A protein has these predicted regions:
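Short, glycine/acidic-enriched loop or turn micro-motifs at the edges of active sites
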Residues: 79-81, 184, 219
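Short helix-coil junctions and helix-kink-helix linkers
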Residues: 22-36
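Acidic, divalent-metal-coordinating active-site segment for phosphoryl/phosphodiester hydrolysis
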Residues: 213-225
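Short, cationic-aromatic polyanion-contact patches
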Residues: 51-66
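Acidic two-metal-ion nuclease catalytic site recognized across multiple nuclease folds
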Residues: 2-7, 12-19, 36-37, 46, ...
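Short alpha-helix plus adjacent loop in nuclease-associated cores
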Residues: 179-196
Length: 262
C-alpha cells in the first residue's frame, strides 16, 4: 500500500489550500485510487473531509475545525497476527466530541481458527467467532460508522494500516481519514517512564479491562481526552492538534512557550 503517497498528498493540503485541478491530479496519481471515480463525495466516503471555496480551491476541514467541534473516532482491533499473515477478529470504536462519547461500535469477526496465544491474550476463541459476521460485512459497517472523522488509536499505524489494507482487499478502497496517535500525543503532554496503554491506564487511573477491542478503544479515548485538556493555549484547530502530536521539541518551542507536563 502506498501510504507514503497518501500521507504526502494530505500533508501538502495541510500546508495550504490547493487548486481543484491539483487535488484531482494528485488524488488520481495514488496507486490505490487509480480506479476510483474522482469527485468530492467519493473523497468524503473514503474518509477525507475537505472544503471547496469560491476560488475553486480545496482545503482540509481540519484546518478550520475547532478541537471541541471535531469528531474523533478512537479505534482498537484484535487480530490473529500481522497484516500480512493474520486477520481482524474484533473491532471496537468510540466516537467522542467535546469530551463526550456520542457513539460506539463493536463487532467480532468470523474466523476459522484463533491461535492459542491470541485466545490467551484476548479471551476470544474460535467458538466465539463461529457465528460472527464475515469480515467484509463488518468492515462495511465500520466504515459507515467512521465516516470522515479523525481516526485515533494507541499506536495508530497498526490499527489504521490493518483496517485500511483489509478494506482495500475487500474492494472498499483504502482509508483517507486523517489519523492521530495517542502514544505520540502522550509523549508530548504526559510525563511517564512508559507509554504503553497499560502504563498510561495505571498512571491516569483508567479503570477498563484490557486486550478487548472496545475496552481498549475506551481507554485510548480517555487518554485522548486527558491530553486535550493539557494542550497549550495556542493549539486551537484539529490540524494544530495533529501537527502538535508529530512535532519535535524544537518545533514546539518555535510555536510558543514550553509545554507543561502533567
Amino acid at each position: 500500500m502506498s501510504q507514503q503517497q497518501i500521507d504526502a498528498f494530505i500533508n501538502e493540503l495541510a500546508k495550504q489550500s490547493k487548486p481543484y485541478a491539483w487535488f484531482e491530479r494528485e488524488f488520481s496519481a495514488i496507486d490505490e485510487l487509480e480506479f476510483v471515480d474522482f469527485d468530492l463525495d467519493n473523497v468524503k466516503l473514503l474518509g477525507l473531509s475537505v472544503n471547496l471555496n469560491a476560488k475553486n480551491e480545496i482545503s482540509l476541514k481540519s484546518k478550520s475545525t475547532k478541537i471541541k467541534d471535531e469528531i474523533f473516532c478512537v479505534v482498537d482491533i484484535e487480530s490473529t497476527g500481522s497484516v500480512r499473515s493474520g486477520q481482524i477478529i474484533e473491532i471496537g470504536a468510540v466516537k467522542v466530541q467535546n469530551g463526550k462519547e456520542i457513539a460506539r461500535f463493536e463487532s467480532l469477526v468470523r474466523a476459522s481458527e484463533v491461535p492459542e496465544n491470541i485466545s490467551e491474550l484476548t479471551g476470544i476463541t474460535s467458538k466465539m467467532l463461529a457465528n460472527a459476521p464475515h469480515l467484509p460485512a463488518v468492515l462495511n459497517e465500520f466504515r459507515l460508522f467512521l465516516g470522515d472523522s479523525i481516526f485515533v488509536a494507541h499506536n495508530v499505524g497498526f490499527d489504521y494500516g490493518f483496517i485500511s489494507a483489509s478494506l482495500d482487499k475487500c474492494g472498499f478502497g483504502v482509508l483517507l481519514n486523517q489519523r492521530l496517535c495517542t502514544i505520540n500525543l502522550s509523549r508530548r503532554l504526559i510525563a511517564s517512564p512508559k507509554y504503553s496503554l497499560a502504563a498510561l491506564k495505571e498512571l491516569l487511573d483508567i479503570q477498563t479491562p484490557h486486550h478487548r477491542a472496545l475496552a481498549d478503544a475506551l481507554s485510548a479515548a480517555n487518554i485522548l481526552q486527558h491530553c486535550i485538556s493539557k494542550l497549550p493555549f495556542y493549539i486551537k484547530s484539529t490540524q494544530d492538534l495533529l501537527n502538535f502530536s508529530k512535532s519535535t521539541l524544537k518545533e514546539r518551542k518555535a510555536m510558543s512557550e514550553p509545554v507543561l507536563l502533567r
